[in-house]
């Protein structure tokens, strides 16, 4: 098992290096400070959504409605701000509450009525898309009123000052090291096998270098964009939940073997419903960032984001069968997808070939998951 995980981990690193190297040669602006700052914003939005998707997939379920939910909740907040003149914080809070309630409802239907998540969330995809268009009345709704900046619009226009960015980078690396050492100690204390020290150190070293490199490059433009901080906070919360709480252990148990989890006393229904409730909150946050990044709610906001989130998870080593996956893997998967899409945009690749490439990458990731699972 350990060797298979190492193959997957290092294959992701190699793939990322090759992708970045290719676009650095074919599209020189790819490594510019301005583009990397934009890339950081884009991957932060997708990565935030993928963190929620990780928890859903860990339970052995799937959520196809998140893309439409991103549009709906972002659009609802825009309408409350622009048309109802509601203060931005109140509008964001109201839309977040709606998101949590909608996803709690879907989670309840899945576990109480025993309806497959695929069907429930597919229905949600269509319903939320229709509601989204009704809410914005098939028009463009700005995130500001009278062009005056507010909390909503600042989600993607605020940048952390350079020195503060470096301090936050150091803090993030310290948290990564602490979390890794704590997790390793807990596994050893319970007699579970742990990764060899060299591999663990190499991963942390690469992660630390990547964090500082991104911050240094971002500081050459305007600084670290706010979405990157939001992703960091969401990532920390999800990592803590999945690795250091009973809820996280239940997520893995339900996805690994639901029948065994029931016998062991795991409250399966509550765990799944809670995972969907958290997903609703994360969809809302993603919707606000995506809409603010676009500058307004339009009928295309959120399109296919569910596929990008699923692809980031699968590329990052999350098993679609449930019970296996990690936050770090999802971050790598998100980074690979974001670099791929950003690079193709810089090369002016036609949309049809972008779709084909995304489909091929997702298919290849699933194929590798199946092959490594059988090895």
Task: For each feature predicted by the language model, list its residue ranges.
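Cytosolic-side transmembrane-helix boundaries in multi-pass membrane proteins
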Residues: 1-21, 25, 140, 172-205, ...
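Membrane-helix/interface signature in polytopic inner-membrane proteins
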Residues: 180-196, 236-276
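Inter-helical junctions in multi-pass inner-membrane proteins, predominant
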Residues: 28-38, 133, 137, 215-228, ...
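Transmembrane alpha-helical segments in multi-pass inner-membrane proteins
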Residues: 103, 276-287, 293-359
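Transmembrane helix-bundle core of multi-pass membrane transporters
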Residues: 125-242, 298-299
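Loop-to-transmembrane alpha-helix initiation sites
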Residues: 42, 117, 143-146, 161-170, ...
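Alpha-helical transmembrane segments within multi-pass membrane transporters and channels
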Residues: 85-126, 332, 337
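Single transmembrane alpha-helix segments in multi-pass membrane proteins
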Residues: 19-84, 108-118, 133, 260, ...
């Amino acid at each position: 098992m350990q060797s298979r995980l190492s193959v997957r981990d290092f294959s992701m690193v190699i793939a990322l290096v090759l992708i970045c190297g290719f676009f650095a040669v074919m599209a020189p602006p790819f490594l510019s400070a301005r583009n990397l700052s934009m890339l950081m914003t884009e991957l932060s939005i997708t990565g935030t959504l993928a963190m929620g998707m990780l928890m859903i997939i860990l339970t052995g379920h799937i959520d196809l409605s998140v893309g439409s939910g991103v549009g709906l909740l972002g659009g609802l907040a825009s309408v409350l701000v622009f048309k109802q003149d509601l203060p931005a914080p109140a509008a964001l809070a109201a839309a977040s509450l709606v998101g949590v309630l909608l996803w709690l409802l879907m989670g309840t239907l899945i576990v109480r009525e025993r309806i497959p998540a695929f069907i429930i969330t597919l229905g949600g995809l269509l319903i939320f898309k229709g509601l989204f268009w009704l809410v914005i009345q098939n028009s463009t709704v700005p995130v500001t009123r009278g062009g005056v900046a507010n909390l909503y619009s600042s989600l993607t226009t605020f940048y952390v000052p350079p020195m503060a960015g470096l301090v936050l980078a150091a803090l993030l690396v310290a948290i990564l090291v602490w979390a890794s050492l704590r997790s390793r100690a807990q596994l050893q204390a319970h007699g579970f096998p742990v990764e060899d020290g060299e591999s663990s150190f190499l991963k942390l070293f690469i992660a630390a270098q990547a964090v500082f490199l991104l911050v240094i490059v971002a500081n050459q433009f305007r600084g670290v964009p706010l979405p990157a901080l939001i992703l960091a906070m969401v990532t920390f919360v999800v990592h803590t939940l999945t690795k250091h709480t009973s809820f996280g252990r239940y997520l893995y148990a339900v996805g690994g073997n639901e029948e065994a989890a029931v016998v062991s006393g795991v409250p399966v229904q509550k765990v799944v419903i809670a995972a969907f409730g958290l997903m609703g909150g994360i969809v809302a946050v993603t919707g606000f960032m995506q809409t603010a990044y676009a500058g307004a709610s339009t009928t295309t906001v959120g399109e296919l984001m569910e596929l990008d989130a699923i692809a980031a998870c699968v590329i990052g080593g999350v098993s679609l069968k449930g019970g296996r996956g990690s936050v770090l893997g999802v971050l790598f998967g998100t980074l690979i997808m974001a670099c791929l899409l950003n690079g193709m945009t810089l090369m002016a690749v036609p949309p049809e070939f972008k779709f084909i490439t995304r489909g091929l990458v997702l298919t290849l990731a699933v194929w590798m998951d199946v092959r490594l699972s059988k090895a």
